[in-house]
Structure formats: C-alpha cells, structure tokens
C-alpha cells in the first residue's frame, strides 16, 4: 500500500461515510487505476467511482528562509452498496 498514505477525518469526510464514500490522502504520482486496484486488493471491496483533487502545499518560514510543504492528492472513493471498510467506519464521539 505504497500509494495510500492515510485516511482523512474531516466534517465532510465523516458526512460522506453515510453515503458509503471514503476519503484518503494518496501520493500525488499515483494514478486512479493504481489506487482502485490497491483499495480492491487490500480491503476486499468493489469500487464504483473515484473523485480526486490536488491540495496545494503551504508556505513555511524558518527565519529568513522561506520554504514550502509538498502538495498532495485527496481521493474520495465510492464503494458498491453492501461493502464497507471496517477500520474507517467509526463514529465520532
């Protein structure tokens, strides 16, 4: 699972869990077919749709030196009805 970095838990992503959509950050060089293959292989689910967008990096300053963080890619994966990813299906308390 080199391409999938981690799951994202924001207000929007928690709301999308009710629609059987899961959000995760992936490496920016990964393709949609790779991500779909990894999700189907490692989690044993069927993916029916994928949406992605690239989030920009942010500027970081250390004294007079201005740097930046790398941009990253976020995928919203829609699963077929009846499938779910158990570790990501937790309620917020």
Curated annotation (Swiss-Prot):
InterPro entries tied to this protein: Nucleotide-bd_a/b_plait_sf, Ribosomal_uL23-like, Ribosomal_uL23/eL15/eS24_sf, Ribosomal_uL23_CS
Biological processes annotated in GO: translation
Pfam families in alphabetical order: Ribosomal_L23 (PF00276)
Cellular component terms per the entry's GO annotation: chloroplast; ribonucleoprotein complex; ribosome
Quaternary structure (record): Part of the 50S ribosomal subunit.
SUPFAM superfamilies hit by this protein: Ribosomal proteins S24e, L23 and L15e
Entry keyword Acyltransferase: no
Family annotation (PROSITE patterns): RIBOSOMAL_L23
GO molecular function, one term: structural constituent of ribosome
Keyword Transmembrane helix: no
Record's protein name: Large ribosomal subunit protein uL23c
Highest taxon of source: Eukaryota
Compartment(s) of residence: Plastid, Chloroplast
Species per Swiss-Prot/TrEMBL record: Prunus persica (Peach)
Signal peptide: none
Keywords recorded for this protein, A-Z: Chloroplast, Plastid, Ribonucleoprotein, Ribosomal protein, RNA-binding, rRNA-binding
Similarity-based family: Belongs to the universal ribosomal protein uL23 family.
Function: Binds to 23S rRNA.
């Amino acid at each position: 699972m080199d391409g999938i970095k981690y799951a994202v838990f924001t207000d929007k992503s928690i709301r999308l869990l009710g629609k059987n959509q899961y959000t995760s950050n992936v490496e920016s060089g990964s393709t949609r077919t790779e991500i779909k293959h990894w999700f189907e292989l490692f989690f044993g689910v069927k993916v029916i749709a994928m949406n992605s967008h690239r989030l920009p990096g942010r500027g970081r300053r250390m004294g007079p030196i201005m740097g930046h963080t790398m941009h990253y890619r976020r995928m919203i994966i829609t699963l077929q009805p009846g499938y779910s990813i158990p570790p990501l299906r937790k309620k917020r308390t």
